[in-house]
């Protein structure tokens, strides 16, 4: 169990307001729920996060905040595996991009070796 100060530090780190700790999760927006999941992982000192479409359904502001959080976690040494259809977000937050088709990995790239234009072109090559 985290001490109250540690709990608030964790909530702050993921961008949740202090009153979030006293509210029921069902009252949270989708973006807040995503952040709660990351907060739980941080509280448990998880070394890896597995995320399935973490920014789908989020408004642009919440999506950007969540992506910034993922970049911070990556920079702090967390391993993050994120399944997403948003390759531009993957390029911004990841270090590697894998493109899958019919359940098979068809391409793997370093985010350093591709531009945003390349990402779209490569994606379209494999999806059609």
PLM region descriptions:
Residues 38:
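Hydrophobic anchor residue at the start of the ABC signature
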Residues 49-52:
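Catalytic Walker B motif of ABC-type/P-loop ATPase nucleotide-binding domains
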Residues 60-62:
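Helix N-cap at the start of a conserved alpha-helix in ABC-type nucleotide-binding domains
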Residues 64-76:
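Helical segment within the ABC ATPase nucleotide-binding domain
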Residues 84-85:
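H-loop/switch region of ABC-family ATPase nucleotide-binding domains
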Residues 90-92:
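A short, surface-exposed alpha-helical micro-motif characterized by mixed small hydrophobic
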